[in-house]
């Protein structure tokens, strides 16, 4: 089976590498390029014609939505998945109108991304299964493209800043590192409550694991460690 050529458009190196690491868990996908600017994305789109683009909206030299408009105007035959912190309904509505396959709001739950990639793989496989389609086949295609009711929720906790959240995850790049809400609060210069909110979001998104530790005086304390190995920012 041919691989699904994939272009990642993300200006944060660490986030781009996390996406690459996640995509590598699916053998049917092949990352053929990473663009950190709109201009570079346009060039790679023209050069590679990837079958899938994972796209951020906020780029140093423009908006990802402009790349979608450009793709539509040039009759791009692949599909686009928006992965962005942009939660404005105006952007979401236009992205839907322009035909994006899915729209994921950062910080993204790993299982949510996994579900989207699996759906896209099934969608593409179904498209290639025959030259002519029955109504049943058409119904299946549209059901695959639409999000199933069993899809996991991806709404982040309130008060989560994306850049701070990614900084917290980076602290756990070494799998031997553990933190508590107290130790993280000192690093972030925040309250213990705020630090715990980020740690619990990491657990919710399957990036971190939490355990109960009983200290020297027997008082239980919640400690956190990395569930995945994150690449160092370059």
From Swiss-Prot:
It is found in: Cytoplasm. Residues 5-121 form the Response regulatory domain. Keywords: Activator, Cytoplasm, DNA-binding, Phosphoprotein, Transcription, Transcription regulation, Two-component regulatory system. GO terms for molecular function: DNA binding; DNA-binding transcription factor activity; phosphorelay response regulator activity. GO terms for cellular component: cytoplasm. Residues 181-200 bind DNA. The modification 4-aspartylphosphate is found at residue 56. Phosphorylated by CitA. Its main location: cytoplasm. Pfam families: HTH_64, Response_reg. In vitro CitB and the CitA kinase domain form a complex, formation of which is enhanced by ATP. Member of the two-component regulatory system CitA/CitB essential for expression of citrate-specific fermentation genes. Phosphorylated CitB binds to two sites in the citS-citC intergenic region where it probably activates transcription of both genes. This is Transcriptional regulatory protein CitB. It comes from Klebsiella pneumoniae. The lineage of its organism: Bacteria, Pseudomonadati, Pseudomonadota, Gammaproteobacteria, Enterobacterales.
């Amino acid at each position: 089976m041919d691989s699904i050529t994939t272009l990642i458009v993300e200006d944060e190196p660490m986030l781009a590498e996390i996406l690459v690491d996640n995509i590598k868990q699916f053998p049917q996908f092949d990352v053929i390029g990473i663009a950190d600017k709109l201009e570079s994305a346009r060039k790679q789109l023209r050069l590679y014609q990837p079958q899938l683009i994972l796209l951020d909206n906020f780029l140093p030299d423009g908006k990802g939505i402009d790349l979608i408009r450009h793709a539509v105007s040039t009759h791009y035959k692949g599909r686009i998945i928006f992965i962005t912190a942009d939660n404005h309904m105006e952007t979401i509505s236009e992205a839907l109108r322009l035909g994006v396959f899915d729209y994921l709001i950062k910080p993204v739950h790993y299982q949510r991304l996994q579900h989207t990639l699996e759906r896209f793989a099934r969608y593409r496989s179904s498209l290639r299964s025959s030259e002519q389609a029955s109504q049943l086949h058409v119904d299946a295609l549209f059901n695959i493209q639409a999000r199933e009711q069993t899809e996991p929720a991806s709404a982040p906790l309130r008060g989560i800043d994306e850049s701070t959240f990614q900084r917290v995850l980076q602290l756990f790049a070494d799998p031997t590192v553990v933190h508590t809400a107290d130790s993280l609060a000192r690093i972030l210069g925040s309250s213990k409550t705020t630090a715990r909110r980020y740690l619990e979001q990491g657990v919710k998104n399957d990036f971190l694991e939490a355990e109960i530790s009983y200290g020297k005086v027997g008082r239980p304390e919640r400690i956190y460690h990395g569930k995945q190995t994150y690449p160092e920012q370059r």
